[in-house]
Amino acid sequence: MHKYGFAIYYGDDLKQDFNFGKQMKQAVFLIQSPDRKGLVSGITTFFYRNGFNILHCQQYTDTCEGEYYMRVRLDLSDMELTRKQLEDDFSAFATEYGFRYSVYYLDQPQRVAVLVSKTSHCLYDLLTLNQEGELPCEIPLIISNHPDLEHVADKFRVPFFCCPIVNGDKASQEAQILELLERHLIDLVVLARYMQVLSNGFTERYPRRIINIHHAFLPAFQGGNPYQRAWERGVKMIGATAHYATAELDEGPIIEQDVERITHEADPAELKHIGSGIEKRVLTRAVRAHLEHRIITTGRRTVVFSR
């Protein structure tokens, strides 16, 4: 994190300029600022004066908090500046206007690790969509605390690593997982029904880069076995929530949610079946939003721009 409060993210080859085709020479800027007059004009003028074409621009003003949010996707094909020059110039500009920002270059896909336990539906969905080109990322490994889903990884030809908790030593197991994540240069961790609570130290290593799917419409039915508890309460709709994982269980910023209506005729098994479908689509939407750099986190909330 820069002293002025912004972060710069690259692909695998950090801090290098890439010579890819024009179609990949794009960048996304995410901007957050106290709302003020002239802000939009100042930002767009900066890009115009430096010869950038704005391909897509979205903005939102939170009138309750007085905050302004913007997502800008730029064409870098005709950029005469180096990336370092662009970053230095925009840093000075951001300091002058007093806003925070991050910039992402699109010429390298993010590297995603999927953590699972014994349930396969979310894993299958992510791998299938990735294989079909619907999720713009690389998945170099799958990690589990059980061996049950190794056959799924084999089917998609993704390396599988089993990291069990031996004699209750969860700290050693997490250290093993973290070593794998570092070795494979992982940008995003997806908890696809990984049924272990991560330690504070783990989540702090990947702030806003761990996405969890919770099989309930948070904040209702936090923790385990939500479908049984939902049935016991006689709920008339069930849902799922994807959120960034933090030190507090199921309390991280919410990215995506969905629900379906049910009736008294649905038993716990039927609720679980319906819920599995909701979980898949909610997790996929959240992961896609992160990969496409459409999320700005603000406190315990998120601003998620549409596609």
Residues covered by each model-derived region:
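Donor/substrate-binding cores of folate-linked one-carbon enzymes
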Residues: 146, 169-175, 184-307
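A conserved regulatory-domain signal marking ACT and ACT-like small-molecule sensing domains
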Residues: 20-110
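Short, glycine-rich nucleotide/cofactor-binding loops
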Residues: 112-121
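Histidine-anchored nucleotide/phosphate-binding helix
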Residues: 121-132
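Residues that mark the start of a beta-strand
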Residues: 109-113, 209
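N-terminal amphipathic/basic-hydrophobic helices that include classical n-h-c signal peptides
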Residues: 1-23
